[in-house]
Amino acid sequence: MPEQGIEAQLRLQRGAFRLDAHLQLPANGISVLLGRSGSGKTTLLRAIAGLERAEGFLQVGGQLWQDATCFRPPHQRSLGYVRQASELLPHLDVRANLEFGYRRIPRARRRLGLDEVIALFGLEDLLDQRAEWLPNGPRQRVAIACALLTSPDLLLLDAPLICLDRHSRAQILPALEQLRGQLRIPLLYVTHSQDEVTRLADHLILLDKGKTFASGPPGRLLSDPRLPLNHPDEAAVVLIGQVEHHDPHYRLSTVRVPGGTLSVSLSRLPPGAETRVRIFARDVSLSLDPPHNSSILNILRVRIADLFHEQDSARVMVRLDLDSACILARITRLSADRLGLAPGLQVYAQIKSVALME
């Protein structure tokens, strides 16, 4: 598929609800669609799949799927679609479900091998089981695998983990993370989970009342306090870094991120591997001078970009510039005034906790 992603302007009226979505998404990686319940996320995915007859324009990978003069029906759109509760062919076993779409794809067009996908999702012990007997977790693993084995040009995932327990989610997330760097197609992923956003998103789209109102790299959007992503207590940013080395004695790993290095819990990843860390604004304090003799391991020199005073609150959100990224600090207004904090001022960010997302 050409290195072109998704371009869409889709409009749809359903009673009092109106979808008016504008998308321009990268050609590969995971684009996460985030919004409140009822904001139109599922409706947008159904419109992209052709299951809802929306007006407008849709192009995927340089191929026109619809405009004012043409409309490809769902069966002519090269896509995989996995829902919250996916349906399999109940009378067939897991292997037959996997092979059903795979065998219909010409060998030259297959993006992934059958055995490769079986291993990726840990399906070896399920192959002879009837699909109708599968619990929710294994069922979703099989459903995602089936969608991938059709070698689609676009994969739509509508909150595929929302009904699963923690153990089942932990089996699927690493596979999706691996696919992100391996599969050269766009994935459009709906979720309500901040953990999933942190671990999976290469691109973030915010939807509210049927309209897309922000789109871009997660680091930029998550570090903008003006966007209604989280309650201020839960505000956090994600930094992409690289594992530098491990210290088995203290059970710590060093990760290089924009602006310096961070000590994190001992990682399973080898040195040189890319990883992601999450830093909550509530876990960051500020100092004008380099802290000495502190128990806090992670201290970065940063520059204040902006201060945002929270309405009817004693708190202020401070956005801090690193070399090519931002983090947030949520402190009291009293502390901000005492320190004389202002845009452009250089300070030291003391990070009490860093979560390694793996």
From Swiss-Prot:
Entry's Gene Ontology cellular component terms: plasma membrane
Keyword Nucleotidyltransferase (UniProt): no
Enzyme Commission number(s) from the entry: 7.3.2.5
Keywords: ATP-binding, Cell inner membrane, Cell membrane, Membrane, Molybdenum, Nucleotide-binding, Translocase, Transport
GO molecular function: ABC-type molybdate transporter activity; ATP binding; ATP hydrolysis activity
Pfam families the UniProt entry points to: ABC_tran, TOBE
Domain ABC transporter: 1-234
Gene3D superfamilies, per database record: 2.40.50.100, P-loop containing nucleotide triphosphate hydrolases
Compartments (UniProt record): Cell inner membrane
Top-rank EC class of the record's enzyme: translocase
Subunit structure, as described in the record: The complex is composed of two ATP-binding proteins (ModC), two transmembrane proteins (ModB) and a solute-binding protein (ModA).
Record-linked PANTHER family: ABC TRANSPORTER I FAMILY MEMBER 10, MOLYBDENUM IMPORT ATP-BINDING PROTEIN MODC 2
Function text: Part of the ABC transporter complex ModABC involved in molybdenum import. Responsible for energy coupling to the transport system.
Protein name: Molybdenum import ATP-binding protein ModC 2
Record organism: Azotobacter vinelandii
High-level lineage: Bacteria, Pseudomonadati, Pseudomonadota, Gammaproteobacteria, Pseudomonadales
